[in-house]
Regions:
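His/Cys-centered metal/cofactor-coordination and adjacent catalytic loops
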Residues: 23-30, 43-70
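Short, hydrophobic secondary-structure boundary micro-motifs
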Residues: 53-54, 93-96, 121
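The canonical Cys-X-X-Cys-His
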Residues: 34-48, 108-112, 129
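Bacterial N-terminal signal peptides that target proteins for export
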Residues: 2-11
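Bacterial N-terminal signal peptides
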Residues: 11-21
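Extracytoplasmic electron-transfer domains, predominantly the class I c-type cytochrome c fold
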Residues: 59-115
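Sequence context surrounding c-type heme c attachment/ligation sites in exported
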Residues: 32-43, 75-79, 90
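Electrostatic cytochrome c docking/interface patches
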Residues: 21-37, 117-129
Length: 129
């Protein structure tokens, strides 16, 4: 069996994403919770689609990170959770470790990962059959 070009591209994409299963993972039960946290705490800077184009973005220097970029997608969950918890020095990204409990940080991370997978703004997954 010789893998097709689309099979090879899918494998390359999965490997680029660090093998995290981001593209194949099903929406978790934390989706709604993570989405609510994102709307409340993240959307103003990172925007509805995670591109870093929220309503506050034009006023921030440096601009907010693009959460759906290849560079962000390649980061491990641990790296992203560290950024959520500790913030980013010399940016407007605050530390959330004393604001959000660990399970909320994990839920928002799962929601951010879903933005890459679905590539659509703040829409819940379609209802099952």
């Amino acid at each position: 069996y010789l893998p097709s070009m689309s099979d090879r591209l899918l494998l390359a994409l999965l490997l680029t994403c660090g093998g995290t299963g981001v593209l194949l993972a099903q929406p978790s039960e934390n989706f709604d919770h993570g989405q609510a946290i994102y709307r409340e705490h993240c959307m103003e800077c990172h925007g509805t689609t995670g591109k870093g184009d929220g309503v506050k973005a034009p006023f921030l220097s440096p601009r907010p990170g693009n959460l759906i970029s290849a560079a962000t997608s390649a980061k491990t969950d641990q790296e992203l959770l560290r950024t959520i918890a500790q913030g980013k020095p010399r940016t407007a990204m605050p530390a959330w470790q004393n604001v959000l409990p660990a399970e909320d940080q994990q839920a928002v991370l799962q929601y951010i990962r879903s933005l890459v997978r679905f590539a659509r703004p703040l829409a819940p997954p379609p209802p099952g059959p």
